[in-house]
Amino acid sequence: LQNISPPPSPPLATPTIPYTVGLLLSKLTGRSLPYSAAVLAVALKYVSWARNRGRTPLRGSVLTSLHNIVFSGQTLLRARDTSLLSTLLGDALGLALLWRALCAAHAILQVRFMSLKEIADAAGETGFSVISAIPMMRAKVEKEFAKEESKMEAMLKKPGREITTVIPENGMEDEAIVTSMRTLAGKENTKWQEGKVSGCVYHGEAEHLAVLNAAYNLYAVSNPLHPDVWPSVMKYEAEVVAMTASLLNGGDEGVCGCISSGGTESIVLAVKTHREWARRTKGIVDPEIIVASTAHAAFDKACEILCVRLIKIESDPITFKLDPRKVKRRLSANTILIVGSAPNYPQGTIDPIEDLAKIAQRHGCGMHVDCCLGGFVLPFARELGYDLGGNFDFGVAGVTSMSCDTHKYGYAHKGTSVVLYRSKSLRHHQYFTYPQWTGGLYCTPTIAGSKAGGLIAATWASMMRLGHSGYRDAVRKIMAVATTIKATIAEEIHGIHLLGDPKAMVVAFGVDPRPRPINVYTISDLMAKKGWSLNALQRPASVHICVTYIHTAEGVVENFIADLTECVDAACAAADDPNAEPSKDGNAPVYGMAESLPPGPLNESAFL
Protein backbone atom coordinates (compact mmCIF):
# COMPACT_ATOMS: atom_id res chain seq x y z
CA LEU A 1 0.00 0.00 0.00
CA GLN A 2 2.90 2.39 0.66
CA ASN A 3 3.89 2.17 -2.99
CA ILE A 4 0.42 3.06 -4.22
CA SER A 5 -0.08 6.67 -5.23
CA PRO A 6 -3.61 7.87 -5.73
CA PRO A 7 -4.35 9.79 -8.91
CA PRO A 8 -4.33 13.57 -8.67
CA SER A 9 -7.49 15.05 -7.21
CA PRO A 10 -9.43 17.32 -9.56
CA PRO A 11 -12.00 19.72 -8.11
CA LEU A 12 -15.04 17.99 -6.68
CA ALA A 13 -17.37 19.71 -9.15
CA THR A 14 -15.63 18.26 -12.22
CA PRO A 15 -14.87 14.58 -11.58
CA THR A 16 -13.76 12.24 -14.32
CA ILE A 17 -14.43 8.55 -14.69
CA PRO A 18 -10.71 7.59 -14.67
CA TYR A 19 -10.23 9.61 -11.49
CA THR A 20 -13.22 8.03 -9.77
CA VAL A 21 -12.32 4.47 -10.75
CA GLY A 22 -8.62 4.98 -10.07
CA LEU A 23 -9.17 6.41 -6.61
CA LEU A 24 -11.64 3.68 -5.77
CA LEU A 25 -9.22 0.96 -6.85
CA SER A 26 -6.27 2.56 -5.08
CA LYS A 27 -8.14 2.82 -1.82
CA LEU A 28 -9.53 -0.69 -1.97
CA THR A 29 -6.52 -2.53 -3.34
CA GLY A 30 -6.21 -5.86 -1.66
CA ARG A 31 -9.75 -5.83 -0.32
CA SER A 32 -12.93 -7.44 -1.57
CA LEU A 33 -16.03 -5.26 -1.89
CA PRO A 34 -19.49 -6.45 -2.98
CA TYR A 35 -20.23 -5.30 -6.50
CA SER A 36 -23.46 -3.55 -5.58
CA ALA A 37 -21.74 -1.48 -2.88
CA ALA A 38 -19.10 -0.34 -5.34
CA VAL A 39 -21.72 0.64 -7.90
CA LEU A 40 -23.66 2.58 -5.28
CA ALA A 41 -20.52 4.35 -4.14
CA VAL A 42 -19.75 5.47 -7.70
CA ALA A 43 -23.38 6.56 -8.09
CA LEU A 44 -23.10 8.64 -4.92
CA LYS A 45 -20.05 10.35 -6.38
CA TYR A 46 -21.83 11.42 -9.54
CA VAL A 47 -25.10 12.33 -7.87
CA SER A 48 -23.13 14.57 -5.55
CA TRP A 49 -21.27 16.10 -8.50
CA ALA A 50 -24.51 16.69 -10.42
CA ARG A 51 -26.24 18.33 -7.48
CA ASN A 52 -23.26 20.62 -6.78
CA ARG A 53 -22.64 21.50 -10.39
CA GLY A 54 -24.92 24.45 -10.68
CA ARG A 55 -27.44 24.59 -7.92
CA THR A 56 -27.91 23.59 -4.31
CA PRO A 57 -24.88 22.08 -2.57
CA LEU A 58 -25.43 19.06 -0.36
CA ARG A 59 -23.53 20.40 2.62
CA GLY A 60 -24.55 18.66 5.80
CA SER A 61 -26.63 16.00 4.04
CA VAL A 62 -26.25 12.26 4.55
CA LEU A 63 -25.32 11.89 0.88
CA THR A 64 -22.44 14.33 1.22
CA SER A 65 -21.21 12.64 4.38
CA LEU A 66 -21.18 9.25 2.71
CA HIS A 67 -19.48 10.70 -0.34
CA ASN A 68 -16.82 12.41 1.73
CA ILE A 69 -16.10 9.27 3.74
CA VAL A 70 -15.77 7.14 0.62
CA PHE A 71 -13.99 9.44 -1.83
CA SER A 72 -12.74 12.80 -0.65
CA GLY A 73 -10.01 11.80 1.78
CA GLN A 74 -12.05 12.67 4.88
CA THR A 75 -12.63 10.14 7.63
CA LEU A 76 -15.20 9.71 10.36
CA LEU A 77 -12.85 11.50 12.75
CA ARG A 78 -11.31 14.27 10.64
CA ALA A 79 -12.68 16.63 8.01
CA ARG A 80 -9.52 17.44 6.08
CA ASP A 81 -7.68 15.74 3.26
CA THR A 82 -5.11 13.22 4.43
CA SER A 83 -2.81 10.69 2.84
CA LEU A 84 -4.06 7.39 1.52
CA LEU A 85 -2.64 5.37 4.41
CA SER A 86 -4.32 7.44 7.08
CA THR A 87 -7.71 7.35 5.38
CA LEU A 88 -7.71 3.73 4.25
CA LEU A 89 -9.12 2.39 7.51
CA GLY A 90 -11.65 5.17 7.79
CA ASP A 91 -12.82 4.75 4.21
CA ALA A 92 -13.07 0.98 4.59
CA LEU A 93 -15.08 1.48 7.76
CA GLY A 94 -17.38 3.90 5.98
CA LEU A 95 -17.97 1.52 3.11
CA ALA A 96 -18.53 -1.34 5.54
CA LEU A 97 -21.13 0.67 7.44
CA LEU A 98 -22.78 1.63 4.17
CA TRP A 99 -22.89 -2.00 3.03
CA ARG A 100 -24.27 -3.20 6.36
CA ALA A 101 -26.98 -0.56 6.14
CA LEU A 102 -27.90 -1.81 2.68
CA CYS A 103 -28.01 -5.41 3.91
CA ALA A 104 -30.23 -4.43 6.82
CA ALA A 105 -32.55 -2.29 4.70
CA HIS A 106 -34.78 -5.20 3.71
CA ALA A 107 -35.09 -6.41 7.30
CA ILE A 108 -35.86 -2.88 8.49
CA LEU A 109 -38.57 -2.48 5.87
CA GLN A 110 -40.12 -5.79 6.93
CA VAL A 111 -40.53 -4.66 10.55
CA ARG A 112 -43.87 -3.06 9.71
CA PHE A 113 -45.24 -6.52 8.89
CA MET A 114 -43.93 -8.20 12.04
CA SER A 115 -45.85 -8.95 15.21
CA LEU A 116 -44.57 -7.78 18.57
CA LYS A 117 -43.54 -11.37 19.32
CA GLU A 118 -41.50 -11.57 16.12
CA ILE A 119 -39.83 -8.24 16.84
CA ALA A 120 -39.04 -9.37 20.38
CA ASP A 121 -37.58 -12.62 19.06
CA ALA A 122 -35.40 -10.78 16.55
CA ALA A 123 -34.20 -8.31 19.18
CA GLY A 124 -33.58 -11.13 21.64
CA GLU A 125 -31.60 -13.09 19.08
CA THR A 126 -29.41 -10.10 18.31
CA GLY A 127 -28.93 -9.32 21.99
CA PHE A 128 -28.12 -12.92 22.81
CA SER A 129 -25.52 -13.04 20.03
CA VAL A 130 -23.87 -9.85 21.30
CA ILE A 131 -23.84 -11.03 24.92
CA SER A 132 -22.50 -14.44 23.90
CA ALA A 133 -19.55 -12.75 22.23
CA ILE A 134 -18.38 -11.44 25.63
CA PRO A 135 -15.85 -14.03 26.88
CA MET A 136 -17.16 -14.17 30.44
CA MET A 137 -20.80 -14.51 29.36
CA ARG A 138 -19.86 -16.94 26.61
CA ALA A 139 -18.24 -19.22 29.18
CA LYS A 140 -21.38 -19.23 31.34
CA VAL A 141 -23.63 -19.98 28.37
CA GLU A 142 -21.39 -22.80 27.18
CA LYS A 143 -21.35 -24.25 30.70
CA GLU A 144 -25.15 -24.37 30.83
CA PHE A 145 -25.39 -25.89 27.37
CA ALA A 146 -22.78 -28.48 28.35
CA LYS A 147 -24.97 -29.56 31.26
CA GLU A 148 -27.98 -30.08 28.99
CA GLU A 149 -25.83 -31.85 26.42
CA SER A 150 -24.59 -34.32 29.03
CA LYS A 151 -28.20 -35.00 30.08
CA MET A 152 -29.21 -35.69 26.48
CA GLU A 153 -26.24 -37.98 25.96
CA ALA A 154 -27.08 -39.90 29.12
CA MET A 155 -30.65 -40.31 27.88
CA LEU A 156 -29.71 -41.44 24.36
CA LYS A 157 -26.49 -43.36 24.95
CA LYS A 158 -27.29 -46.36 27.09
CA PRO A 159 -24.48 -47.50 29.42
CA GLY A 160 -22.80 -50.82 28.77
CA ARG A 161 -23.12 -50.74 25.01
CA GLU A 162 -20.09 -51.82 23.07
CA ILE A 163 -18.97 -49.11 20.65
CA THR A 164 -17.10 -50.04 17.46
CA THR A 165 -14.93 -47.30 16.00
CA VAL A 166 -12.72 -49.23 13.55
CA ILE A 167 -13.40 -51.99 11.04
CA PRO A 168 -12.61 -55.33 12.71
CA GLU A 169 -9.55 -57.10 11.37
CA ASN A 170 -11.53 -60.29 10.84
CA GLY A 171 -15.19 -60.32 9.98
CA MET A 172 -17.81 -61.58 12.41
CA GLU A 173 -19.77 -64.74 11.85
CA ASP A 174 -23.14 -64.28 10.14
CA GLU A 175 -25.09 -65.66 13.08
CA ALA A 176 -23.21 -63.46 15.55
CA ILE A 177 -24.04 -60.33 13.55
CA VAL A 178 -27.73 -61.12 13.33
CA THR A 179 -27.95 -62.16 16.98
CA SER A 180 -26.32 -58.94 18.15
CA MET A 181 -28.63 -56.79 16.05
CA ARG A 182 -31.70 -58.79 17.03
CA THR A 183 -30.92 -58.20 20.71
CA LEU A 184 -30.75 -54.42 20.32
CA ALA A 185 -33.78 -54.25 18.03
CA GLY A 186 -35.85 -56.34 20.41
CA LYS A 187 -35.29 -53.88 23.24
CA GLU A 188 -36.25 -50.92 21.07
CA ASN A 189 -39.27 -52.37 19.29
CA THR A 190 -41.33 -52.99 22.40
CA LYS A 191 -42.44 -49.39 22.92
CA TRP A 192 -43.83 -48.78 19.42
CA GLN A 193 -45.31 -52.25 19.21
CA GLU A 194 -47.36 -51.45 22.31
CA GLY A 195 -48.68 -48.31 20.60
CA LYS A 196 -46.99 -45.87 22.98
CA VAL A 197 -45.17 -43.77 20.38
CA SER A 198 -46.52 -40.68 18.64
CA GLY A 199 -45.99 -41.05 14.89
CA CYS A 200 -42.66 -42.72 13.99
CA VAL A 201 -44.07 -46.13 13.03
CA TYR A 202 -47.25 -45.82 11.01
CA HIS A 203 -48.33 -49.42 10.36
CA GLY A 204 -46.07 -52.09 11.79
CA GLU A 205 -48.11 -55.26 11.22
CA ALA A 206 -45.84 -58.27 10.75
CA GLU A 207 -47.62 -59.51 7.61
CA HIS A 208 -47.34 -56.12 5.92
CA LEU A 209 -43.67 -55.76 6.82
CA ALA A 210 -42.95 -59.25 5.51
CA VAL A 211 -44.27 -58.36 2.05
CA LEU A 212 -42.32 -55.09 2.00
CA ASN A 213 -39.13 -56.85 3.09
CA ALA A 214 -39.57 -59.49 0.39
CA ALA A 215 -40.01 -56.79 -2.26
CA TYR A 216 -36.94 -54.96 -1.00
CA ASN A 217 -34.83 -58.13 -1.04
CA LEU A 218 -35.70 -58.75 -4.69
CA TYR A 219 -34.31 -55.32 -5.62
CA ALA A 220 -31.73 -54.83 -2.87
CA VAL A 221 -28.89 -54.13 -5.34
CA SER A 222 -30.92 -52.11 -7.86
CA ASN A 223 -30.25 -48.46 -8.64
CA PRO A 224 -32.72 -46.26 -10.57
CA LEU A 225 -29.75 -44.28 -11.87
CA HIS A 226 -29.30 -47.17 -14.31
CA PRO A 227 -32.75 -47.73 -15.85
CA ASP A 228 -31.25 -49.82 -18.63
CA VAL A 229 -30.20 -52.41 -16.03
CA TRP A 230 -33.35 -52.26 -13.87
CA PRO A 231 -36.22 -51.02 -16.08
CA SER A 232 -38.80 -52.53 -13.71
CA VAL A 233 -37.72 -50.11 -10.96
CA MET A 234 -38.44 -47.22 -13.33
CA LYS A 235 -41.88 -48.77 -13.91
CA TYR A 236 -42.55 -49.00 -10.17
CA GLU A 237 -41.58 -45.38 -9.62
CA ALA A 238 -43.77 -44.14 -12.46
CA GLU A 239 -46.74 -46.10 -11.13
CA VAL A 240 -46.26 -44.93 -7.53
CA VAL A 241 -46.17 -41.32 -8.75
CA ALA A 242 -49.24 -41.84 -10.95
CA MET A 243 -51.25 -43.50 -8.17
CA THR A 244 -50.34 -40.74 -5.72
CA ALA A 245 -51.27 -38.05 -8.24
CA SER A 246 -54.61 -39.74 -8.87
CA LEU A 247 -55.29 -39.83 -5.14
CA LEU A 248 -54.70 -36.07 -4.96
CA ASN A 249 -57.00 -35.11 -7.86
CA GLY A 250 -54.18 -34.92 -10.37
CA GLY A 251 -54.78 -38.08 -12.35
CA ASP A 252 -56.35 -36.40 -15.38
CA GLU A 253 -54.57 -33.07 -15.09
CA GLY A 254 -51.14 -34.00 -16.38
CA VAL A 255 -49.72 -33.98 -12.86
CA CYS A 256 -46.30 -35.64 -12.67
CA GLY A 257 -43.42 -35.97 -10.25
CA CYS A 258 -40.83 -38.32 -8.82
CA ILE A 259 -39.88 -40.26 -5.70
CA SER A 260 -37.48 -38.64 -3.25
CA SER A 261 -35.77 -39.84 -0.08
CA GLY A 262 -38.31 -38.23 2.26
CA GLY A 263 -40.46 -35.21 2.96
CA THR A 264 -37.52 -32.88 3.48
CA GLU A 265 -36.03 -33.67 0.08
CA SER A 266 -39.45 -33.31 -1.55
CA ILE A 267 -39.75 -29.84 -0.04
CA VAL A 268 -36.21 -28.86 -1.04
CA LEU A 269 -36.92 -30.02 -4.59
CA ALA A 270 -40.18 -28.06 -4.77
CA VAL A 271 -38.44 -24.86 -3.65
CA LYS A 272 -35.54 -25.48 -6.04
CA THR A 273 -37.93 -26.08 -8.93
CA HIS A 274 -39.84 -22.86 -8.33
CA ARG A 275 -36.60 -20.92 -7.89
CA GLU A 276 -35.31 -22.11 -11.27
CA TRP A 277 -38.70 -21.55 -12.91
CA ALA A 278 -38.85 -17.97 -11.62
CA ARG A 279 -35.27 -17.24 -12.64
CA ARG A 280 -35.63 -18.60 -16.16
CA THR A 281 -39.12 -17.34 -16.97
CA LYS A 282 -39.44 -14.17 -14.89
CA GLY A 283 -35.84 -13.09 -14.33
CA ILE A 284 -36.12 -13.19 -10.52
CA VAL A 285 -32.64 -13.41 -8.99
CA ASP A 286 -33.53 -12.58 -5.37
CA PRO A 287 -36.39 -15.03 -4.77
CA GLU A 288 -38.68 -15.11 -1.75
CA ILE A 289 -41.15 -17.69 -0.47
CA ILE A 290 -43.93 -17.09 2.06
CA VAL A 291 -44.66 -19.67 4.75
CA ALA A 292 -46.47 -19.82 8.07
CA SER A 293 -44.62 -20.15 11.36
CA THR A 294 -46.23 -23.60 11.62
CA ALA A 295 -44.76 -24.76 8.29
CA HIS A 296 -42.26 -27.59 8.50
CA ALA A 297 -38.65 -26.66 9.30
CA ALA A 298 -37.66 -28.29 6.01
CA PHE A 299 -38.61 -24.99 4.33
CA ASP A 300 -36.04 -23.20 6.50
CA LYS A 301 -33.48 -25.79 5.45
CA ALA A 302 -34.43 -25.46 1.78
CA CYS A 303 -34.09 -21.68 1.85
CA GLU A 304 -30.73 -21.87 3.58
CA ILE A 305 -29.38 -24.38 1.07
CA LEU A 306 -30.82 -22.63 -2.00
CA CYS A 307 -30.19 -19.02 -0.92
CA VAL A 308 -33.89 -18.14 -1.04
CA ARG A 309 -35.28 -15.48 1.28
CA LEU A 310 -37.82 -16.94 3.70
CA ILE A 311 -40.75 -14.71 4.61
CA LYS A 312 -42.27 -16.30 7.71
CA ILE A 313 -45.70 -15.14 8.88
CA GLU A 314 -46.89 -15.82 12.41
CA SER A 315 -49.85 -18.18 12.32
CA ASP A 316 -53.10 -17.14 13.93
CA PRO A 317 -52.70 -17.74 17.71
CA ILE A 318 -56.21 -19.22 17.95
CA THR A 319 -56.68 -21.22 14.75
CA PHE A 320 -52.97 -21.88 14.05
CA LYS A 321 -53.61 -21.28 10.36
CA LEU A 322 -51.96 -18.98 7.84
CA ASP A 323 -53.95 -15.77 7.38
CA PRO A 324 -54.38 -14.96 3.65
CA ARG A 325 -54.65 -11.23 4.44
CA LYS A 326 -51.16 -11.25 5.93
CA VAL A 327 -49.89 -13.13 2.89
CA LYS A 328 -51.20 -10.40 0.58
CA ARG A 329 -49.29 -7.77 2.55
CA ARG A 330 -46.03 -9.67 2.22
CA LEU A 331 -46.17 -10.27 -1.53
CA SER A 332 -43.47 -8.65 -3.63
CA ALA A 333 -42.09 -8.77 -7.14
CA ASN A 334 -39.66 -11.42 -5.88
CA THR A 335 -42.27 -13.80 -4.44
CA ILE A 336 -41.94 -17.14 -6.21
CA LEU A 337 -43.92 -19.43 -3.92
CA ILE A 338 -46.64 -19.47 -1.26
CA VAL A 339 -46.73 -22.49 1.04
CA GLY A 340 -49.69 -24.06 2.81
CA SER A 341 -49.78 -27.14 5.05
CA ALA A 342 -52.39 -29.88 4.99
CA PRO A 343 -52.06 -30.46 7.86
CA ASN A 344 -49.20 -28.75 9.65
CA TYR A 345 -47.01 -30.86 11.90
CA PRO A 346 -47.32 -29.02 15.25
CA GLN A 347 -51.08 -28.52 15.75
CA GLY A 348 -52.48 -30.58 12.87
CA THR A 349 -54.56 -27.73 11.43
CA ILE A 350 -55.06 -27.23 7.70
CA ASP A 351 -54.23 -23.88 6.11
CA PRO A 352 -56.87 -22.25 3.84
CA ILE A 353 -55.41 -23.74 0.66
CA GLU A 354 -58.13 -22.44 -1.66
CA ASP A 355 -57.71 -18.82 -0.54
CA LEU A 356 -53.91 -19.04 -0.69
CA ALA A 357 -54.03 -20.59 -4.17
CA LYS A 358 -56.21 -17.73 -5.44
CA ILE A 359 -53.65 -15.23 -4.18
CA ALA A 360 -50.83 -17.18 -5.84
CA GLN A 361 -52.74 -17.38 -9.11
CA ARG A 362 -53.46 -13.64 -9.18
CA HIS A 363 -49.86 -12.82 -8.30
CA GLY A 364 -48.41 -15.23 -10.85
CA CYS A 365 -46.36 -17.27 -8.39
CA GLY A 366 -46.31 -20.91 -7.34
CA MET A 367 -48.44 -22.53 -4.63
CA HIS A 368 -47.03 -25.53 -2.77
CA VAL A 369 -49.13 -27.72 -0.48
CA ASP A 370 -47.09 -29.62 2.09
CA CYS A 371 -49.14 -32.79 2.38
CA CYS A 372 -46.29 -34.95 3.67
CA LEU A 373 -48.25 -35.89 6.77
CA GLY A 374 -51.76 -35.95 5.34
CA GLY A 375 -51.32 -37.15 1.77
CA PHE A 376 -52.60 -40.66 2.46
CA VAL A 377 -55.10 -39.61 5.15
CA LEU A 378 -57.01 -36.52 4.00
CA PRO A 379 -58.28 -37.94 0.67
CA PHE A 380 -59.80 -40.93 2.45
CA ALA A 381 -61.10 -38.83 5.34
CA ARG A 382 -62.86 -36.65 2.77
CA GLU A 383 -64.28 -39.77 1.15
CA LEU A 384 -65.55 -40.92 4.56
CA GLY A 385 -67.43 -37.65 5.02
CA TYR A 386 -65.17 -35.80 7.45
CA ASP A 387 -65.21 -32.00 7.20
CA LEU A 388 -61.71 -30.86 6.26
CA GLY A 389 -62.58 -27.18 5.90
CA GLY A 390 -62.06 -27.05 2.12
CA ASN A 391 -60.11 -28.63 -0.71
CA PHE A 392 -56.36 -28.97 -0.44
CA ASP A 393 -55.00 -30.75 -3.52
CA PHE A 394 -54.69 -30.39 -7.31
CA GLY A 395 -58.44 -30.00 -7.49
CA VAL A 396 -57.72 -26.41 -6.43
CA ALA A 397 -56.74 -24.19 -9.34
CA GLY A 398 -53.47 -22.45 -8.55
CA VAL A 399 -51.81 -25.32 -6.69
CA THR A 400 -48.59 -25.96 -8.60
CA SER A 401 -46.84 -28.58 -6.44
CA MET A 402 -47.39 -30.95 -3.53
CA SER A 403 -45.26 -33.13 -1.27
CA CYS A 404 -46.64 -36.41 0.05
CA ASP A 405 -44.78 -38.97 2.17
CA THR A 406 -45.30 -42.59 1.20
CA HIS A 407 -43.22 -43.71 4.18
CA LYS A 408 -45.78 -42.28 6.62
CA TYR A 409 -49.43 -43.14 6.00
CA GLY A 410 -48.54 -44.77 2.69
CA TYR A 411 -47.12 -47.47 4.99
CA ALA A 412 -43.94 -47.97 2.97
CA HIS A 413 -40.42 -48.38 4.31
CA LYS A 414 -38.63 -45.28 5.58
CA GLY A 415 -36.86 -43.29 2.91
CA THR A 416 -39.52 -42.53 0.30
CA SER A 417 -41.71 -39.54 -0.50
CA VAL A 418 -43.40 -38.20 -3.62
CA VAL A 419 -43.10 -34.65 -4.95
CA LEU A 420 -45.73 -33.71 -7.54
CA TYR A 421 -46.00 -30.86 -10.05
CA ARG A 422 -48.90 -29.47 -12.03
CA SER A 423 -47.11 -29.99 -15.36
CA LYS A 424 -44.07 -31.55 -16.97
CA SER A 425 -42.80 -28.13 -17.95
CA LEU A 426 -42.61 -27.15 -14.28
CA ARG A 427 -41.01 -30.45 -13.27
CA HIS A 428 -38.33 -29.87 -15.92
CA HIS A 429 -36.84 -27.16 -13.70
CA GLN A 430 -36.19 -29.73 -10.98
CA TYR A 431 -33.66 -31.70 -13.02
CA PHE A 432 -29.92 -31.24 -12.89
CA THR A 433 -28.11 -31.87 -16.17
CA TYR A 434 -24.44 -31.60 -17.04
CA PRO A 435 -23.81 -32.83 -20.60
CA GLN A 436 -20.17 -31.59 -20.71
CA TRP A 437 -18.89 -33.98 -18.03
CA THR A 438 -15.96 -36.11 -19.19
CA GLY A 439 -17.68 -39.12 -17.63
CA GLY A 440 -20.56 -38.82 -20.07
CA LEU A 441 -24.01 -37.28 -19.97
CA TYR A 442 -25.09 -36.70 -16.37
CA CYS A 443 -28.71 -36.06 -15.46
CA THR A 444 -30.47 -36.62 -12.13
CA PRO A 445 -34.06 -35.72 -11.24
CA THR A 446 -33.46 -35.45 -7.48
CA ILE A 447 -30.68 -34.35 -5.16
CA ALA A 448 -29.33 -37.87 -4.85
CA GLY A 449 -27.62 -39.59 -7.75
CA SER A 450 -27.89 -43.22 -6.81
CA LYS A 451 -31.07 -44.27 -5.01
CA ALA A 452 -32.24 -47.49 -3.39
CA GLY A 453 -34.39 -49.29 -5.93
CA GLY A 454 -35.46 -51.67 -3.20
CA LEU A 455 -37.28 -48.85 -1.38
CA ILE A 456 -39.16 -47.91 -4.54
CA ALA A 457 -40.16 -51.54 -5.07
CA ALA A 458 -41.32 -51.83 -1.45
CA THR A 459 -43.39 -48.66 -1.81
CA TRP A 460 -45.11 -50.06 -4.88
CA ALA A 461 -45.74 -53.32 -3.01
CA SER A 462 -47.32 -51.45 -0.08
CA MET A 463 -49.76 -49.56 -2.29
CA MET A 464 -50.67 -52.65 -4.30
CA ARG A 465 -51.15 -54.78 -1.18
CA LEU A 466 -53.46 -52.40 0.68
CA GLY A 467 -55.40 -51.00 -2.24
CA HIS A 468 -57.89 -48.17 -2.00
CA SER A 469 -60.15 -50.05 0.39
CA GLY A 470 -57.27 -50.95 2.68
CA TYR A 471 -56.18 -47.33 3.01
CA ARG A 472 -59.77 -46.22 3.54
CA ASP A 473 -60.32 -48.75 6.34
CA ALA A 474 -57.09 -47.71 8.04
CA VAL A 475 -58.08 -44.04 7.91
CA ARG A 476 -61.54 -44.87 9.27
CA LYS A 477 -59.95 -46.44 12.35
CA ILE A 478 -57.35 -43.68 12.76
CA MET A 479 -59.92 -40.90 12.53
CA ALA A 480 -62.13 -42.66 15.08
CA VAL A 481 -59.26 -42.79 17.59
CA ALA A 482 -58.26 -39.17 16.94
CA THR A 483 -61.87 -38.03 17.35
CA THR A 484 -62.10 -39.86 20.68
CA ILE A 485 -58.92 -38.23 21.98
CA LYS A 486 -60.07 -34.76 20.85
CA ALA A 487 -63.46 -35.13 22.50
CA THR A 488 -61.94 -36.39 25.75
CA ILE A 489 -59.46 -33.52 26.00
CA ALA A 490 -62.13 -30.95 25.15
CA GLU A 491 -64.82 -32.24 27.49
CA GLU A 492 -63.43 -34.49 30.22
CA ILE A 493 -59.80 -33.71 31.14
CA HIS A 494 -59.62 -30.53 33.20
CA GLY A 495 -56.40 -28.52 33.06
CA ILE A 496 -55.58 -28.86 29.36
CA HIS A 497 -57.26 -27.77 26.13
CA LEU A 498 -57.03 -28.42 22.40
CA LEU A 499 -54.94 -26.15 20.21
CA GLY A 500 -56.88 -25.03 17.16
CA ASP A 501 -59.39 -27.24 15.39
CA PRO A 502 -57.42 -30.27 14.16
CA LYS A 503 -59.22 -31.95 11.28
CA ALA A 504 -57.25 -35.17 11.01
CA MET A 505 -54.91 -37.37 13.04
CA VAL A 506 -52.71 -34.90 14.92
CA VAL A 507 -54.06 -33.77 18.31
CA ALA A 508 -52.19 -31.04 20.21
CA PHE A 509 -52.96 -29.72 23.67
CA GLY A 510 -51.76 -26.93 25.92
CA VAL A 511 -52.45 -26.09 29.55
CA ASP A 512 -55.35 -23.99 30.81
CA PRO A 513 -54.60 -20.65 32.49
CA ARG A 514 -54.81 -20.98 36.27
CA PRO A 515 -53.51 -19.13 39.37
CA ARG A 516 -50.61 -21.59 39.71
CA PRO A 517 -49.75 -22.51 36.10
CA ILE A 518 -48.93 -26.04 34.98
CA ASN A 519 -45.86 -26.80 32.90
CA VAL A 520 -47.14 -28.77 29.91
CA TYR A 521 -43.73 -30.40 29.56
CA THR A 522 -44.14 -31.82 33.04
CA ILE A 523 -47.19 -33.66 31.72
CA SER A 524 -45.08 -34.95 28.84
CA ASP A 525 -42.40 -36.14 31.27
CA LEU A 526 -44.96 -37.88 33.47
CA MET A 527 -46.35 -39.63 30.39
CA ALA A 528 -42.80 -40.67 29.46
CA LYS A 529 -42.43 -42.35 32.84
CA LYS A 530 -45.50 -44.40 31.94
CA GLY A 531 -43.84 -45.45 28.69
CA TRP A 532 -45.42 -42.92 26.31
CA SER A 533 -43.28 -41.03 23.79
CA LEU A 534 -45.15 -37.86 22.81
CA ASN A 535 -43.92 -34.86 20.82
CA ALA A 536 -43.04 -31.73 22.77
CA LEU A 537 -43.77 -28.49 20.88
CA GLN A 538 -42.93 -24.87 21.51
CA ARG A 539 -44.17 -21.36 20.70
CA PRO A 540 -46.67 -21.99 22.23
CA ALA A 541 -45.63 -24.62 24.76
CA SER A 542 -47.67 -27.70 23.97
CA VAL A 543 -47.61 -31.45 23.34
CA HIS A 544 -49.16 -33.52 20.58
CA ILE A 545 -49.86 -37.10 19.65
CA CYS A 546 -49.86 -38.17 16.02
CA VAL A 547 -52.33 -41.05 15.80
CA THR A 548 -51.19 -43.96 13.63
CA TYR A 549 -52.60 -47.33 12.64
CA ILE A 550 -50.88 -48.91 15.66
CA HIS A 551 -53.01 -46.78 17.99
CA THR A 552 -56.14 -48.42 16.62
CA ALA A 553 -55.29 -51.71 18.33
CA GLU A 554 -57.59 -52.79 21.13
CA GLY A 555 -57.09 -50.96 24.41
CA VAL A 556 -54.45 -48.46 23.24
CA VAL A 557 -56.63 -45.34 23.16
CA GLU A 558 -58.25 -46.27 26.49
CA ASN A 559 -54.82 -46.63 28.11
CA PHE A 560 -53.70 -43.32 26.63
CA ILE A 561 -56.71 -41.43 27.95
CA ALA A 562 -56.41 -43.00 31.41
CA ASP A 563 -52.69 -42.22 31.67
CA LEU A 564 -53.11 -38.68 30.32
CA THR A 565 -55.88 -37.94 32.82
CA GLU A 566 -53.75 -39.24 35.68
CA CYS A 567 -50.68 -37.25 34.58
CA VAL A 568 -52.64 -34.00 34.19
CA ASP A 569 -54.12 -34.44 37.67
CA ALA A 570 -50.64 -35.10 39.07
CA ALA A 571 -49.22 -32.01 37.35
CA CYS A 572 -52.06 -29.87 38.72
CA ALA A 573 -51.49 -31.22 42.23
CA ALA A 574 -47.76 -30.50 42.00
CA ALA A 575 -48.44 -26.96 40.76
CA ASP A 576 -50.78 -26.33 43.69
CA ASP A 577 -48.23 -27.62 46.21
CA PRO A 578 -46.12 -24.64 47.38
CA ASN A 579 -43.39 -26.98 48.65
CA ALA A 580 -43.00 -28.89 45.38
CA GLU A 581 -39.70 -28.36 43.56
CA PRO A 582 -39.59 -28.06 39.77
CA SER A 583 -38.32 -31.10 37.92
CA LYS A 584 -34.69 -31.01 36.83
CA ASP A 585 -34.96 -34.01 34.52
CA GLY A 586 -36.73 -34.75 31.25
CA ASN A 587 -38.06 -32.27 28.70
CA ALA A 588 -39.44 -29.71 31.14
CA PRO A 589 -36.18 -27.83 31.88
CA VAL A 590 -34.91 -28.10 28.29
CA TYR A 591 -38.06 -26.76 26.66
CA GLY A 592 -38.53 -24.27 29.46
CA MET A 593 -35.18 -22.81 28.50
CA ALA A 594 -36.16 -22.92 24.83
CA GLU A 595 -39.34 -20.97 25.52
CA SER A 596 -37.42 -18.25 27.36
CA LEU A 597 -34.83 -17.76 24.61
CA PRO A 598 -35.23 -16.47 21.06
CA PRO A 599 -35.12 -19.28 18.48
CA GLY A 600 -31.85 -18.53 16.71
CA PRO A 601 -29.32 -18.69 19.54
CA LEU A 602 -30.68 -21.93 20.97
CA ASN A 603 -30.55 -23.63 17.58
CA GLU A 604 -27.07 -22.38 16.81
CA SER A 605 -25.51 -22.91 20.22
CA ALA A 606 -27.27 -25.90 21.71
CA PHE A 607 -27.68 -28.23 18.78
CA LEU A 608 -24.55 -27.66 16.71
Where are these regions (language model features)?
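Active-site C-terminal subdomain of aminotransferase-like
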Residues: 380-516, 597-600
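Non-catalytic terminal extensions of PLP-dependent enzymes
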Residues: 2-234, 238-242, 246, 472, ...
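Active-site pre-lysine segment of PLP-dependent enzymes
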Residues: 324-328, 350-362, 374-401
